[in-house]
Amino acid sequence: VYSNDNLDNSVLIGSVTISKNAPQYFQVPVRNMIIVSPTFSNPTADLFKPVNKGLYVNGDKPFYASLRFSVLNHGELITSKGMAGIGTEFRAVMAPMTANNDILNFMTSVMATEDNTKVTISDFNSNISFTDGVTRSSFTFTLKKGQSYIIDGTGDYSDNRNGAFIGAKIVSDKPVSITNGNFNGQY
């Protein structure tokens, strides 16, 4: 299991040995490797910029992995997509928000597999109010290997509801991995 350090180096943070009928678990040693760290004065501190968040798992043979974590009042399960989850063109998918509620959100995260990966996200409602307070018609950014870029919007703005970000087009010039959905959603 690898993660990037503060100097953008891919660092081995641990390993487990698995075999048929002998699954294992790995406890992430530091939660801020996977969870953003907002503060009262800067609630989007780790959003809308390249950050060293995320994990990369690798093995000698094919295997299945999932990520389970929890924060106060909420648990999350992220399934592994394997090599099928690596590519250069994706569409954002999440549950639509229909209620006016600031605890509901949508999110998309892009993680680079190679240095100097240019990513463009477009084809979404340009009236969306993202949590950084900026409305935009597209995103363009460059990531180093192992870096992530996290986008977030909440349900307390009418332009953010009813699937405004669903179907956003994510295109990169090198392979990336995408995680998207709702940290808090309506189902």
Where are the language model's segments positioned?
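Intrinsically disordered, low-complexity linker/terminal regions across diverse proteins
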Residues: 1-187
